[in-house]
Amino acid sequence: MKHIRNFSIIAHIDHGKSTLSDRIIQICGGLSEREMAAQVLDSMDLERERGITIKAQSVTLDYHAKDGQTYQLNFIDTPGHVDFSYEVSRSLAACEGALLVVDAGQGVEAQTLANCYTAMEMNLEVVPVLNKIDLPAADPERVAEEIEDIVGIDATDAVRCSAKTGVGVPDILERLVRDIPPPQGDPDGPLQALIIDSWFDNYLGVVSLIRIKNGSLRKGDKVKVMSTGQSYNADRLGIFTPKRVDRDVLSCGEVGWLVCAIKDILGAPVGDTLTLARNPAEKSLPGFKKVKPQVYAGLFPISSDDYEAFRDALGKLSLNDASLFYEPESSTALGFGFRCGFLGLLHMEIIQERLEREYDLELITTAPTVVYEVITTAQETVYVDSPSKLPALNNIEELREPIAECHMLLPQEYLGNVITLCIEKRGMQTNMVYHGNQVALTYEIPMAEVVLDFFDRLKSTSRGYASLDYNFKRFQTSDMVRVDVLINNERVDALALITHRDNAQYRGRDLVEKMKELIPRQQFDIAIQAAIGNHIIARSTVKQLRKNVLAKCYGGDVSRKKKLLQKQKDGKKRMKQVGNVELPQEAFLAILHVGKDSK
């Protein structure tokens, strides 16, 4: 056991985690030269296209150190994006140490801090690494000072490397072996294995990634899932060298995969503990804290025949992504679908794209909303995650919206622009600290504003230099209203949105104008209105198409023309009474972009 090292790499987006992991795999000979590809561990197409890591991946490598010993390195690659911070905390729970990778040109960013604090809370040994020293803009001295100043780790002897060229990577491995402690645990005690991650394989059933904390697991053992009490046979187990390799035994301290032919998706929940059926452990391991989704949206299949397939797909995805929440919902406009909860907008996009790609579904998404806390006049507390669930106005005593605490790190010259943006988003400044040329800003901003487009706007006002980390702080009373959209005097539930009263007029008008462009013209006038309760705040009309019925009349009596025009008018009137308006998919997406272009 003293030759095992479990570690993960934490860093901000684009600071070179995945490239560094490629080099480590190459040096340890995990894959032959022919199989080596850039970003080996980003195995999803989506990850490669967007250049981001979404899922944590694990690899077991053998490293021949300079002291003549061979060490087993279990290494878990983690995502850097704020929406996937849950993946990071799960990966860290399986490790004893972490490499903190910082770009020597960009310096410390908000995400680096957030993930680093997570690691420190779990008492992991953090080893700082300065990456990208081959860049002309690199300034390792300044960045080393920044790490000490902002993060509070001694970085004077931080390893300097360039993951792209491979300079300094062997030093990192030596440092790992030296500084990161070997796993603790009792190899002879009863088995306790933590499920770090699981995914669904069409041939094998549920595959789980596990970390053995105590005891050992052999092929053919009967294992018991502690939370459900179900027992399964350990059919196959082994390690990743990124490829799956079968082994007969996983011993204490190792990280590996396990297949028990579990067909039920909820059979082995992430964060659960496995133990042996014949000699069970007394108590389960402390799992992970459950994360609460911050953003909710309705997802509906375009054709109702896909509903079953959609439900199965969501089940399989939620197994792989424990932070996804879903429950069935029906809408008068869109039929049956699911209300899904996500950690952020990027998370929502990724899930939607994965559903469309991996499961061939066509989906409509409603506008994302956050969770509001409503105190009714009967003094009950209700949590509302969709505008259609909001009680009637006269039953609401007060409406509280979630407030997010946002930590931003940015260069001084962009401070003015960013503060202006925060004020526009109804933010309250709580703290501001200068670190050299960097400023650390803390604001309390309503979650609804953060979720909508705050991250994109922050990046564009600061030319990409500002970085953001946010978490839910509390609910706070606020003057929020529900804006309904009426089309031909009928409310469309899927188009409703909850917004602050100050912005309601503006957002209502904007939405109505956008709808007018998107709804195709019909044979009759279509009135589009935005309303708060019964009070109409904006209206526009999609003009009817009309045929020129007088084309065949030449001169002659005017009463003939009047008769034809009157006949047309009556026809239109009758049509309007029975006519339905088909809403295109773009109309639902328009809500997402309300208020983006005009500001």
From Swiss-Prot:
Reactions performed catalytically: GTP + H2O = GDP + phosphate + H(+)
Disulfide partners: none
Record EC number: 3.6.5.n1
Top EC group: hydrolase
Database matches in InterPro entries: EF-4, EFG_III/V, EFG_V-like, EFTu-like_2, G_TR_CS, LepA_C_sf, LepA_CTD, LepA_IV
Residues bound to GTP: D14, H15, G16, K17, S18, T19, N131, K132, I133, D134
Coiled coil: none
Membrane topology: Peripheral membrane protein
Family: Belongs to the TRAFAC class translation factor GTPase superfamily. Classic translation factor GTPase family. LepA subfamily.
Any one Pfam family match given in the protein's UniProt record, by short name: GTP_EFTU
Function noted in UniProt: Required for accurate and efficient protein synthesis under certain stress conditions. May act as a fidelity factor of the translation reaction, by catalyzing a one-codon backward translocation of tRNAs on improperly translocated ribosomes. Back-translocation proceeds from a post-translocation (POST) complex to a pre-translocation (PRE) complex, thus giving elongation factor G a second chance to translocate the tRNAs correctly. Binds to ribosomes in a GTP-dependent manner.
Domain of life: Bacteria
Protein name, UniProt field: Elongation factor 4
Alphabetic keyword roster: Cell inner membrane, Cell membrane, GTP-binding, Hydrolase, Membrane, Nucleotide-binding, Protein biosynthesis
GO molecular function terms noted in the UniProt entry: GTP binding; GTPase activity; guanosine tetraphosphate binding; ribosome binding; translation elongation factor activity
Domain spans labelled tr-type G: 2-184
Protein localization: Cell inner membrane
Gene3D superfamilies: 3.30.70.240, Elongation factor 4, C-terminal domain, Elongation Factor G (Translational Gtpase), domain 3, P-loop containing nucleotide triphosphate hydrolases, Translation factors
GO CC entries: plasma membrane
Family annotation (SUPFAM superfamilies): EF-G C-terminal domain-like, P-loop containing nucleoside triphosphate hydrolases
GO biological process, one term: positive regulation of translation
